[in-house]
Amino acid sequence: MERRDFLSKLGMATVTYTLVSGKVFGESDHFHFEKIEVPSPLVGEDLFQYIQRQKGSFDVTLYRQLLGAANEFKEGDEIAGISAASDEDRLKARMLLAETTLDNIRKHSVFTDEQSEFIEQSTRSFQETESGKAIGKLRMREFKELLLLANDAEIKTLLPYLTSDIIACVVKLMSNQELIDISSKIFHPLPGTQMGSKGYMSARVQPNSPTDNIEDIVWQVFDAWSYSVGDLVLGNNPVSSNPESVAKIEMALYDLLTTFKLENTLSHSVLAHIDIQAEVEKTYNGQTGMWFQSIAGTVKANQTFDVTIEKLKKYAAQRKGKFGLYAETGQGADETNGHGEGFDMLIHESRKYGLWRGLKQQLNEESWVHLNDVAGFIGPEVFRTKEQLVRCCLEDLVMGKLHGLMIGLDICTTLHMDVSLDDLDWCIDQIMPANPGYLMALPTKNDPMLSYLTTSFSDHLRIREKFGYKINDAMWAFFKQMEIIDENNKPSAHFGDPVWMYYQYLKLKGDTRSMDEIYSEGLACIERVRERGVPIARGYGVKHWDMNPDLEQEIRLLYADAKKCLWEETPSDFKKSLTQ
């Protein structure tokens, strides 16, 4: 059997599981993933009445299965044995959920640990008010309609009541268009900025290097700024977690910000473990920017990242200034790390946002706190299609915003998913009406260190043109000051020229050499960076949002080669030689 066929069978194989009797009545030849069949509920019956009728008392396993069955299909839920057997079963599970009150969801936890209690505690005071009690009596279908009809200000009055499980449950009932309608009217801008506001869509520059080479990193920042991209954070994923190596990257990024007098306009972040960032901060006080941490949906899953609630609370208490905390999450991470705990990916993801909301409440109101949902990074064991990627992003945007968070997206795919470069463009266009706070930004769609596909500088420019999004006003003014954007708010003659930004940088450093000398040096720098396998964009195609045609062709050839290598079969004569 070829690898592609093997994985296809892995994704398709199922065992159907009947909720009433627990009897397996259909079996594949290879893999055994339970699927949930839901017998027809009674008229007006809610989840807990159904469970009582079927089991005689509350049954948490059945509860988890019903909530999982209410989800849109994803392979990750299927592997966990909590995916609906059919669209009809999914509809029945949603009918039961729709009749269930918010208060009943709040009182019946799918899984209890210190993290779920921390989330509950962050909403408890409001739940005990008269307004909170009134909200708790709403059925999920009524709550969904309220969200669809209410405006931003009205929705924000409801947020203090909402636990993470309630938020995940209402999202299960929504169509993609309903998710877009809600996401496009809830906004939590970062204090003192337009980032996260309606009509604005920012960028995290992701200047990664396969070798943590400082030249690779800073030139990607010059590159981003030459395309008027990069107003939220300069966020590097380091290869090494050595504190000295992390400190070098922190200082290089901080130097860029201070040289251009941007240290109060945007932040930087080196995405090492938060312990390492705190260690670096002891030596370089005030120069580490946003403190980053990957987070999970349960206490045990967070132990995989070597973090605890107490550790995160301790670090949150140390963030006294403007630049607070930055998290990354993604559906499926808990399950693929062995901590699914029997409940679905959507609730896991929502609980991550609940944790971050609770930590945000401990910071001062002027601190920047945001979260990046990395959707698609794990691969087809979580979900495999472009339609599922869109659904995941829309679900997570709404859940993040209902938690009161400024949330961005890493709309990404791995090489072993069934999502191509062109498919990724389609996904972006489906998601953009929901107005995420920000996206990733690289010279091309390919990350040279992480080896996955995400959004390029050109994608940002195309999105702005097509959807009318703007970037933070202060950075737009900076790009005009740097003569990247002209007085008419159009690309200038220097647009798409990272050497021009390098020239500006050196002039600010006091370099008195001629432009020709600096340009010659800059072009040599770009050549060195490219030789290390790190793309640097320069110029553009017919439109300013079109990638340079030569670079576009190069990336497509690399993508085709990578896909071919990934699925290439071992030659039969080589296999035979191993047995000789």
Segments predicted by a language model, with ranges:
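Alpha-helix-loop-beta-strand connector modules within alpha/beta enzyme cores
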Residues: 246-270, 315-316, 390, 394-403, ...
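Catalytic alpha/beta core domains of metabolic enzymes, predominantly
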Residues: 281-428, 434, 440-442
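C-terminal segment of N-terminal export signals and the immediately downstream linker at the start
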Residues: 1, 20-42
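Active-site mouth loops of central-metabolism enzymes
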Residues: 202-216, 414-420
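Glycine-rich, proline-tolerant flexible connector loops at the mouths of alpha/beta enzymes
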Residues: 233-250, 376-384
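Extended, intrinsically disordered, low-complexity segments
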Residues: 34-75, 108-129, 133-136, 140-168, ...
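N-terminal export signals
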Residues: 5-27
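N-terminal small/glycine-rich loop or linker at the start of catalytic domains
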Residues: 187-209, 329-338, 409
